[in-house]
Amino acid sequence: MGNLESTDGGPGEPPSVPLLLPPGKTPMPEPCELEERFALVLSSMNLPPDKARLLRQYDNEKKWDLICDQERFQVKNPPHTYIQKLQSFLDPNVTRKKFRRRVQESTKVLRELEISLRTNHIGWVREFLNDENKGLDVLVDYLSFAQCSVMFDFEGLESGDDGAFDKLRSWSRSIEDLQPPNALSAPFTNSLARSARQSVLRYSTLPGRRALKNSRLVSQKDDVHVCILCLRAIMNYQYGFNLVMSHPHAVNEIALSLNNKNPRTKALVLELLAAVCLVRGGHEIILAAFDNFKEVCKELHRFEKLMEYFRNEDSNIDFMVACMQFINIVVHSVEDMNFRVHLQYEFTKLGLEEFLQKSRHTESEKLQVQIQAYLDNVFDVGGLLEDAETKNVALEKVEELEEHVSHLTEKLLDLENENMMRVAELEKQLLQREKELESIKETYENTSNQVHTLRRLIKEKEEAFQRRCHLEPSARGLESMGGEALARVGPTELTEGIPPSDLDLLAPAPPTEETLPLPPPPAPPLPPPPPPLPDKCPPAPPLPGAAPSVVLTVGLSAIRIKKPIKTKFRLPVFNWTALKPNQINGTVFSELDDEKILEDLDLDRFEELFKTKAQGPALDLICSKNKTAQKAASKVTLLEANRAKNLAITLRKAGRSAEEICRAIHTFDLQTLPVDFVECLMRFLPTEAEVKLLRQYERERQPLEELAAEDRFMLLFSKVERLTQRMAGMAFLGNFQDNLQMLTPQLNAIIAASASVKSSQKLKQMLEIILALGNYMNSSKRGAVYGFKLQSLDLLLDTKSTDRKMTLLHFIALTVKEKYPELANFWQELHFVEKAAAVSLENVLLDVKELGRGMELIRRECSIHDNSVLRNFLSTNEGKLDKLQRDAKTAEEAYNAVVRYFGESPKTTPPSVFFPVFVRFIRSYKEAEQENEARKKQEEVMREKQLAQEAKKLDAKTPSQRNKWQQQELIAELRRRQAKEHRPVYEGKDGTIEDIITVLKSVPFTARTAKRGSRFFCDAAHHDESNC
């Protein structure tokens, strides 16, 4: 424990004993003084930052209790007291009798020193180790002195053989010659150098006979064991650990302590060395110490003595456990796999594997665990080679399986497309039957109406006939009565009371001629003659060559073709943006004559100033003309430069002559001209301006050989009859099958998805549940509704519960699982919605119409040219196009029906909006189901944890149960840390050594593979919180 005060004491004073002060009820000081004293206590306790932070949060009452507890212990002896006593034991001039008296209390002094190093505050330890006291040097020297007699016993010096003593002294001098004296204090660079240097340090000053006899007295006691405990206490502090690791021979002396006859001491040494191996940089130091051990003890092989002790001292289980643990760690804690195999082979040569086979059936469970841990960590090179070969075979198998899976995937896609086609075909048949049913219903209704009408007419006629039968006798009686009355009254009397105008109406009309039909309207006048065509043809570009300027008449404008200019030197390019020839007319440039200006300029000086670099002397223009005349004549080009260059590139790709290309276009030969080339060539259909320029060139009867290859091709190309229609027809012929294969699956997807969505009963029930919950939530505020837009399905995730942990969709998924489990897989009834969601029906219908127009173009061309290629194409593909058009109509009708069925408008809701609603809903529903399952598992874990905590509280009432729980938690935590992918690293922090030793006693060391690291470590947080 940390202490605040210390009092000096001489070497003869009694040992340091913790003095328990009476508890007393000391009143609490003022807050300022309390904080000062509490700060001192915290600094003396040397706690980690997080633990110190927790203590600072205590209230003043708890702080005062802690101060009182800490101040009950005071250090009676300062560090130099123990140092002086140890130095007195090392005095070579002391008489043997006096030494016997002194050495009687050596073990007691060392034990008190160990307690002080372990329990006193860090300030006391630092004082013991500072440069003034050099307590570590004194302690290591005493350890060396205590066991030097053991080293001489290995040479048979127990009997005092002078020859052997001289031999050892001579051997020591030869070792001393390996290193110069000034190199003794330098840090080690490798194991061999360190071993040689430490041997020199140990034996450069050999002890006398009196010192050896004194050493034998010490070796018979527990001084070596307690010295190791003191060093272990020092190394448990970061400051002390660094000092021990940098000490010239501290670790070597610890390793040499393995020669002690006490098995407890050997076990303690091995535990300490194993812990050092697991600290960063410690493994190299331990190996160097055993190199030194080999030189000092004259081993033939490193670790030879260790294996000898391991085999011979089988009666002490603790030592064997510690030895097996050390071997496991020193071999398997390295990251370099090759070095690990090397260390493993070192112990194999020393007979470790044979001994382990004999010891595997030991009765000690601890030893069995350590042996099994080593065997589990063994790096089997042969097995790795076999695994590598197996891996190669497995990789080949994986490739085969991947290829097989690829074929199966393709087959699955084909089956899916075939299934979709069948569904679409059935849907089309269903729609056709529905249409027929509607027609039959309509016919039935019309027939029923006609029958009803006929029955009504028959009934009316029968009633009229009956009335007539009843009225005929009366009519005859009235006629007879009326005749008699007319006979009594004359005709003049009848007409006397009638006005003249009425008499005229009663008089019969005079006969008239038959009315002739009206003549037809005059024909409309003939339309006026069309106006003259405007000048739309662009003027021809200037033609290169040495020919004189030529004036071409194009429409109403005249463009003079400029002759090319020959220069003496190559000149740089002026990157201007040129106007096109058809843009010149009406501008200022049409009024300029730059050729006339050239006659007035000093062109020689211009070329000299602006010529490009690295050119030879100027060429004589006359000579140049003569040489040019000897060469092939320069070509004339009529096409625009970039267009001509692109055309040349396209023609080179074809690898055909102009005649072959034009002949193939005449015959619609797609074998000679691939469709890709046809589509590229369609970009170079001659414009009207180009045709005029080419025709003008021909009318002038200029030689065609002077034209560039592109211009000659364009000349032949433009003479092809109905060129535009032929090229469009060829492109249609070449792309028809691809378009058909592209459009058919899209239409089938629309048809199949529309049918599945419309006919899904489970989807209807899901919507019914959503409608019910929505009305339940909204009825009090907005009133109940009879339906909702499908876009409302996206809002199910936005409606969250009060604790914000669940959405309405999660609740629906939970409700379906509990109340309607048959609806849980409703999405299996919605076929092909994902494919339909990616279809733009409007574009597909436009493409189908384009195919129809293209087929009509082929029909016209076939009627004009009667080409066999076109006839064969029509006979083969007209039926396919008709079927595609019917499918398009069916898809449109099926989609319109399903959209209206769900209350949407086909005009405002395309398939790319309608079907993705279902895709998102299905995906969100599945995720909600998974999250519900995860939440359920988490709740179960929390419930079990809560029950375990309650049981733990009940069981933790007894100390034994509490310790058992702590131990189980510690082991579980350690195993979790071992299983981590990224291993934490032990740094040199306070408490590290004790943490490692505690861990290794609880859990055996487990090595890592080459890819994951090969060492077991604990992280810093584990030191601070769980103390391993």
From Swiss-Prot:
Keyword field: Angiogenesis, Cell membrane, Cytoplasm, Developmental protein, Lipoprotein, Membrane, Myristate, Phosphoprotein
* Entry membrane topology: Lipid-anchor
Q: Per the record, where are the segments of Pro residues compositional bias?
A: 12-28, 517-541
Q: Where this protein primarily resides, as one coarse class?
A: cytoplasm
From the UniProt record, give one GO term of the biological process aspect. Answer: angiogenesis
Lineage start: Eukaryota, Metazoa, Chordata, Craniata, Vertebrata
Phosphothreonine occurs at 95
The record's note on quaternary structure and interaction partners says: Interacts with SRGAP2 (via SH3 domain).
User: Which GO-annotated molecular functions does the record name?
Assistant: actin binding; GTPase activating protein binding; small GTPase binding
What is the scientific name of the source organism? Mus musculus (Mouse)
Q: Where is the composition biased (Low complexity)?
A: 499-516
Q: Where are the N-myristoyl glycine lipid anchors?
A: 2
Q: What Pfam families does UniProt report for this protein, alphabetically? A: Drf_FH3 (PF06367), Drf_GBD (PF06371), FH2 (PF02181)
Q: In this chain, where does the modification Phosphoserine occur?
A: 174, 1014
Annotated DAD domain residues: 986-1018
Give the family from UniProt.
Belongs to the formin homology family.
Q: What is this protein called?
A: Formin-like protein 3
| Domain description | The DAD domain regulates activation via by an autoinhibitory interaction with the GBD/FH3 domain. This autoinhibition is released upon competitive binding of an activated GTPase. The release of DAD allows the FH2 domain to then nucleate and elongate nonbranched actin filaments.
Keyword Cytoplasm in record: yes
What's the gene? Answer: Fmnl3
Q: Any idea what job this protein has? A: Plays a role in the regulation of cell morphology and cytoskeletal organization. Required in the control of cell shape and migration. Required for developmental angiogenesis. In this process, required for microtubule reorganization and for efficient endothelial cell elongation. In quiescent endothelial cells, triggers rearrangement of the actin cytoskeleton, but does not alter microtubule alignement.
Which part of the chain is the FH2 domain? 561-951
